[in-house]
Amino acid sequence: MSERNQRKVYQGRVVSDKMDKTITVVVETYKKDPIYGKRVKYSKKFKAHDENNQAKIGDIVKIMETRPLSATKRFRLVEVVEEAVII
């Protein structure tokens, strides 16, 4: 039996938790400009499955690629790395 492919794991910040069992995570990373070689920061939003609704806005979370769970969800919550500070 063959092994499963290596799945992508990203760490990002929760920007929305308004949907039931779904969070929106923004992942910030750097790309190198092809002409000038300067590192440019860019971000991308992913929707992730949160089975127990445990992540809140501002939390730092780890998400992992999985099978398509809906039209837009392709990731699931692995763990909450750091909880947001509520003032």
UniProtKB/Swiss-Prot annotation:
MF terms (GO), sorted A to Z: rRNA binding; structural constituent of ribosome
Keywords, in A-Z order: Ribonucleoprotein, Ribosomal protein, RNA-binding, rRNA-binding
CDD domains tied to this protein: Ribosomal_uS17
One GO term (biological process): translation
Keyword Ribonucleoprotein: yes
GO cellular component terms attached to this protein's record: cytosolic small ribosomal subunit
A Pfam family of this chain: Ribosomal_S17
Disulphide connectivity of cysteines: none
UniProt keyword Magnesium, yes or no: no
UniProt cross-references to InterPro entries, sorted A to Z: NA-bd_OB-fold, Ribosomal_uS17, Ribosomal_uS17_bact/chlr, Ribosomal_uS17_CS
PROSITE patterns: RIBOSOMAL_S17
Purpose: One of the primary rRNA binding proteins, it binds specifically to the 5'-end of 16S ribosomal RNA.
Assembly: Part of the 30S ribosomal subunit.
NCBIfam families tied to this protein: PRK05610.1, uS17_bact
Family statement drawn from the similarity comment of this UniProt entry: Belongs to the universal ribosomal protein uS17 family.
Stored PANTHER family: 40S RIBOSOMAL PROTEIN S11 FAMILY MEMBER, SMALL RIBOSOMAL SUBUNIT PROTEIN US17M
Record's protein name: Small ribosomal subunit protein uS17
Natural source organism: Bacillus velezensis (strain DSM 23117 / BGSC 10A6 / LMG 26770 / FZB42)
Taxon lineage: Bacteria, Bacillati, Bacillota, Bacilli, Bacillales
